[in-house]
């Protein structure tokens, strides 16, 4: 007997909502009856608006990227027509804004209330005081950003990434943040300054001589050197063991750990290893490890 004959439509729809977008499509493509659900499920990945705007269920896509091409060489170009704010031209259902890498302009009144994800590009380095709505939950400050973040971060912010050139104080991080990533070659003094609500800490640039006392006990997921090709292993005193605490359950280890040996503590359940990682440096894996993931090639 078909599952469609056993379960009510709303039950099937509820089950589908638990699947990632690509699995939803696969599942609904198995038969004509299920395919009819495509107009009723929610799609949570990022999609370019121009690729899906022909569909009748555009409102089911929650994260749309709007792209526009402006030709300054156009014969119809009028240099006196200047858009002073894009707040009023951003569609009301927009949840994410990604700034181009070349963008480095004042963004006063750029970001409307309701935006949840904001990503600044490589060259952006303008003050952002009083311009970030409290609806933002995920903020990435790009490579060049080096402005004060004191008293300017949204009160509902959950994830914060600080870029490569960041050299400012982190004393005023909102207590709502649970994930903090340093992409910088400069790591500020973090001892006693990481809020207790943060459970994921990423140090993906120059690590410096940090110790276990600098990593609060509330950190469950530690990310080290994932994206930035640094020389962090040359400055870590004695061993990685010095900064891995017993409370951690998830550890992500990036590049340049070839010459370091360390133990994975008991209690770690997830281990992610990136390329250029020498697997022989791990002395042993505790029985608590349930998931090991190898990213890219060895």
UniProtKB/Swiss-Prot annotation:
Keywords: Repeat. The keyword Repeat applies. Residues 4-48 form the F-box domain. CDD domains: F-box_SF. FNIP repeats lie at residues 124-165, 255-297. The keyword Repeat applies. It comes from the Viruses. This is Putative F-box and FNIP repeat-containing protein R286. The lineage of its organism: Viruses, Varidnaviria, Bamfordvirae, Nucleocytoviricota, Megaviricetes.
